[in-house]
């Protein structure tokens, strides 16, 4: 789970050229001043009051956001949430696990950031359409079968940056239909601006991963002293 306290001071990044953290707007006395956020295996993001356990009524629809929105054909077993949401400033970031080696047409691996108070989507990073931060138009979907981020992510508040471990595209051990962007983001560490979702950089660890290696763990953030 992730935790957010709307009454606590809001820390801003300290590194130069970092985007500011968006203020959290919550009326005094409203419920869910302290809230817990979790996701479910059937594709929901849920916010509850940390003191009472009640749903946060101002978050999404009755405290829930449908994470299958924009994914197209997505049976429960094809798309699941296998890691906790990440609290990055006032943005809740979620990835998702796409089932391995099922078929070539699978849900996309979009990564999304949501307002911690309202549940409104702030941005989407679609590995198959990385310049567009918006939800797909009605009748359209995020690009299908793209690399996904199913393992835990990391957040550096000093830079307001999210670091994501990326998996491979579908189908994991069959590369014939992979695009140039699949080859760019598969099996890589991806750094995104937590406020905007814009890409900062990407570093690939395995080129054309045909072994389903993925990056299966949370990136570690370490400060080194330079002589």
Predicted segment positions?
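Extracytoplasmic/lumenal domain signature
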Residues: 5-16, 45-76, 110-143, 175-215, ...
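Repeat-blade elements of multi-bladed beta-propeller folds
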Residues: 1-44, 77-103, 108-110, 142-178, ...
């Amino acid at each position: 789970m992730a935790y957010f306290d709307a009454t606590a001071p809001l820390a801003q990044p300290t590194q130069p050229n970092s985007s500011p953290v968006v203020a959290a707007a919550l009326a005094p006395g409203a419920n869910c001043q302290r809230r817990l956020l979790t996701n479910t295996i059937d594709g929901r993001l849920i916010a509850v009051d940390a003191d009472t356990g009640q749903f946060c009524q101002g978050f999404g629809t009755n405290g829930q956001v449908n994470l299958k929105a924009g994914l197209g054909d997505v049976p429960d077993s094809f798309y699941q949430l296998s890691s906790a949401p990440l609290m990055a400033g006032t943005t809740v970031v979620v990835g998702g696990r796409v089932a391995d080696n099922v078929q070539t047409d699978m849900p996309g691996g979009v990564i999304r950031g949501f307002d911690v108070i309202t549940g409104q989507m702030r941005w989407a990073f679609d590995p198959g359409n990385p310049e567009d931060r918006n939800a797909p138009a009605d009748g359209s979907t995020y690009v299908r079968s793209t690399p996904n981020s199913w393992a835990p992510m990391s957040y550096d508040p000093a830079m307001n940056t999210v670091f994501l471990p990326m998996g491979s595209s579908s189908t994991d051990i069959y590369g014939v239909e992979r695009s140039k962007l699949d080859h760019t983001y598969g099996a890589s560490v991806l750094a995104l601006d937590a406020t905007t979702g814009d890409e900062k950089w990407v570093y690939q660890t395995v080129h054309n991963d045909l072994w389903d290696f993925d990056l299966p763990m949370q990136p570690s953030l370490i400060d080194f002293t330079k002589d």
